[in-house]
């Protein structure tokens, strides 16, 4: 049976501060209209290795725990790791920023770095079959653990290595996974975050060249992996990219740009405790 909600209820959901996960980076939260929205479908973080995808995932897993009494969702997180890049030490460093924000608003003895980390359920998987098995368990896990966000880091790693010579099967599986995640997002009011890699594409004809600004014929261009069919399965894409710091006399790529589906761009810098405004 198809269930619907009124347009007014949808508006209230999207504008409520407790229905957004703040990044605590002013420029990024402004671009995101207050933060990452909860319950709207799949949101993809896309970029090359080292562009800050996993860092931003950890920040969201921590910041979703900001209490409702100070405008946060007050929920917990599930973090599904397919690449083994999850670092407990880095998570502890980042948790200090979340805790400082909470204590500045309303100091509470119940909220500590240890509790913030404890409220993130970590699941390590190695292939698509394991992910599908986990997906069948997620509804009960969400109900019993006050879950508000599910993070899969990364989705592309699992799909790309699945039956490499059987593209129809891969397409079928990614559609099945995306539909399951989208339904869960709306039924249980969850934020679904997945990370995706960039892949090299080559264009040899004028028509394709014109579709991508500043791409010369025959030269490589970076695009989100998983193809065009995947694009229709997500509700938002944020592309992360390392940039040179124009404010500093350095060639280091220590600034991150984030571009949304509308072409809007926000910048932040990575620091010891997470991210900060550029």
Language-model regions: role of each:
Residues 35-38, 68-73, 112-115, 140-145, ...:
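Conserved catalytic network of the ASCE P-loop NTPase/AAA+ motor domain
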Residues 22-25, 29, 39, 54, ...:
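Amphipathic alpha-helical transducer elements in NTP-driven molecular machines
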Residues 43-45, 78-80, 121-123, 193, ...:
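Hydrophobic/aromatic beta-strand patches that form the interior of the parallel beta-sheet core
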Residues 26, 30, 62, 89-93, ...:
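Solvent-exposed alpha-helical segments within well-ordered globular domains of core cellular machineries
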Residues 150-179, 204-212:
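Conserved P-loop NTPase nucleotide-binding/switch module
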Residues 172, 179, 183-278:
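Phosphate-binding/switch region of NTP-binding enzymes
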Residues 72-167:
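Conserved inter-motif catalytic segment of the P-loop NTP-binding fold
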Residues 1-105:
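The Walker A/P-loop phosphate-binding site
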